[in-house]
Amino acid sequence: MKPVFAALAMGLGLAAGSIAHAAQPWDGTYVYEQALGPGAGGTQNFVTHTLTVSGPEGCRVVAQGFQTDETIRCKAMPDGNRLLVTFVSFDNGKVENKYGVKLYSPGQPLFVISQAPNGLVTTWQGYSKAAGDGASSAAFKKVGR
């Protein structure tokens, strides 16, 4: 009888764990390829912005490319058909970047991603690497879970 109870308990524990860690609709990886225009010699310069979301506290924005290498810890808050992304800190846990410059305040909105009929729309709010505040574009694309 003990093996049956042990197997049942393990099965229930795994099921409960699966429920507790079920993926949220916004969880996943999003990428925005920002074209900066041609550089010296006519070569096109880009910055790749990768947003990774795994629950509200599991949020990172990594920007890499032309003269850019930055990781931001963020908070991702679902609000219906929108995902609000706010600043927590830089990857080192500080509010100043690796050059000692404070670009954002904790809790400051960076951008909002919204579900639209034709895909995702990004509205920029404070993210310094993007277009001006309030501008909207089809920037981030979901590329994986």
What does each model-found stretch correspond to?
Residues 62-117:
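Contiguous, well-ordered beta-strand patches that form the walls/edges
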Residues 1-4:
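Positively charged n-region of N-terminal signal peptides that target proteins for export
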Residues 41-78, 122-128:
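N-terminal glycine/threonine-rich, aromatic-flanked beta-hairpin/loop signature
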Residues 7-15:
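Bacterial N-terminal signal peptides
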Residues 17-22:
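Sec/Tat signal peptide C-region and signal peptidase I cleavage site
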Residues 31-37, 56-58, 86-94, 125-127:
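Generic short beta-strand segments
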Residues 68-84, 116-145:
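Edge beta-strand at a domain terminus
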Residues 23-44, 122-128, 136, 140-144:
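Tryptophan-anchored aromatic micro-motifs
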